[in-house]
Amino acid sequence: MKGLVIKNTGSSYVVLTDEGRTLNCIVKGNFRLKGIRSTNPVAVGDRVEVSYETSSLKAHTSNLHFITEIEDRRNYIIRKSINLSKQSHILAANVDQALLVVTVSKPETSTTFIDRFLASAEAYRVPVVLIFNKTDLLTANELHYQQLMIQLYETVGYECRAISAETGDGVEELRPLLDGKITLLSGNSGVGKSTLINRLVPGANLRTADISDAHQTGMHTTTFSEMIPLTGGQSLCAPTSQGDSPLVRSWLIDTPGIKGFGTFDMEREELTS
């Protein structure tokens, strides 16, 4: 049977089948992405083939579901660790766009991080919208700096929005951007991704955390990647490889916060074609 990977817990995956069933699965076999060895050969957003086998251990019989094949990806976003391991990690696959949540204070998102994310998304043909969050906490000088950053990125062609997920200011205006699309939500730890999702998806109840006073950096509240439906009810149907789904039109992919974003060596054509 075929389905969509909607959750990655590290050692296992949750797959929403085309028939609307939710299955806990593990990977069977080795998968490669164009020769790149990644920490997660299967990513949230992947279209996969699932099979099951019956296992009998000490007179206990259970059905084990395996991911046996990954359909060709139309795109993906991959990051390389900035530590010595240099391992790669696929954030998500088959996305229509990415929202990069950034903050100019508490914590401050560096332009280096933003530019590396944009370069990686550009290489894999993923449109990006920059979401400047926590506008309610900014001083007059910080608001001026934020406006300069917005002008900079709009000048080079990126759409930017300024919001406060905490107060809700500007959040409803994001909904038309998300309608009918699979959207990756990414950013540093502590920039307010979980708060934003809680605003957009009533009942999501994602855990949030305060900023570390000592380092003014965020602390992880999301520990795994997950697709969250923006429309539809409990009975969900996975979008096919053509993107059609009768019950769910819009998805948000929630990912753990990223402290650093390393990029792979890219050819000039990957960024300009």
For each feature predicted by the language model, list its residue ranges:
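Beta-strand/loop nucleic-acid-binding surfaces
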Residues: 22-40
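Canonical P-loop GTPase G-domain recognition
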Residues: 137-191
